[in-house]
Amino acid sequence: SSTPGAPGRGRGTPARSRYLLAVLLVVAVIAASLAWVVSSPVGSSPDEDFHVGSMWCPPPVDETGCQISTKDGEKAVMVPQSLAKEYVTCYAFDHDNSAQCALNASDEELAPTLRWDDGNYPWGYYQFAHLFVQHSTNRAVLALRAFNALLAIGLLGAIIALADSGLRRAISVALTVAWLPMGFYFIAGMNPSSWAMTGTFAFAAALLASTRSEGRRRVGLVACALAGAVLACTSRGDSAFFLFVITVALAFAVPLSRRIVPEACLACVASAAGIWVMSRTNVAASHLASGSNVSGESWWHIMYLNVSALPDYLRGFVGYLFGPGWNDVSYQGTVSSGASLVVVALLAWSLRSLSWRRVL
């Protein structure tokens, strides 16, 4: 009686091993992400003084209860002193000064800041981030960072779990290679780029995977794609536009048939919404850090700015001319070269199955 049961136990062992491995992998990813969350102080990412100011006083500031003031003759909002630019960035570009200088500011006292969102970003992210506002500015920012990291893990993990085995491996490899090192740095931050990157990747991966799935898996993947589109459209104008770019790419990657009508409808609606969102923002992605305002420009010009910024944007993922902090921490050398080598090796390996459809 024990003999017939032995094969069953043998067949179950690989499944249990895979399940245990998946659980350990998820735990490791969560632990690594939370380590990124607490590894840097408030104000440590590009324009974070702008983002924390917008988090405390989301637009429209006249209706959110924020105190309005003036600074240097310009309209300003009142935020905790610890979030004012002179304190939250006191260590930026100063390699001889640690972030301890930020502790000299108080969470109790208020200070005016000119760094707040006045139409530069779509509605959604800052309004949601405002829900994390509390007495301690450090805890508020860390809580938002942790949420953004767990959101990415949950959404992208669901897509990987629902995708077919072949695509599951491809998505996992692409995600890891493309986002190391800079991608994970932003995902585990409070910058709207966290939602933008999670959303655009989720939209592309889930939509592609859904065209190759059936039943509940397909429904789940379409739902993940929709969630990604919402994140992209509520975080940045450029990520909203990239939904259109992704749709065009998928049109070449997936053969057109009646079967993919639901995915095609979602892609078209998301693309139209993304273009509309981008046209209503005041600042193109490549110009926020430099302070170049393109308010009043046509949406065609804004579209051109976003597309022309793509090469530098992609090179930045491997740390080329781009690093943590306010881009004042260099990844040039081992990190950038190593990441570039991995990307080139992966591209060379992928050429084995290249087709004209994929080239287009």
PLM regions: where:
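Perimembrane helix-loop-helix junctions
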Residues: 209-214, 219, 223, 240-272
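Membrane-lumen/periplasm interface segments of multi-pass, membrane-embedded glycan/lipid transferases
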Residues: 280-353
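Interfacial juxtamembrane loops and adjacent helix segments
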Residues: 60-138
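Specific aromatic-rich, kink-prone transmembrane helix
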Residues: 197-213, 228
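Start-transfer (signal-anchor) and selected internal transmembrane alpha helices
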Residues: 1-35, 263-269
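Transmembrane-helix motifs of polytopic, lipid-linked glycan transferases
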Residues: 143-166
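Short acidic/glycine- and proline-prone juxtamembrane loop motifs at membrane-interface regions
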Residues: 188-196
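Membrane-interface helix-loop-helix junctions at transmembrane boundaries of multi-pass membrane enzymes
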Residues: 164-167, 254-264, 346-360
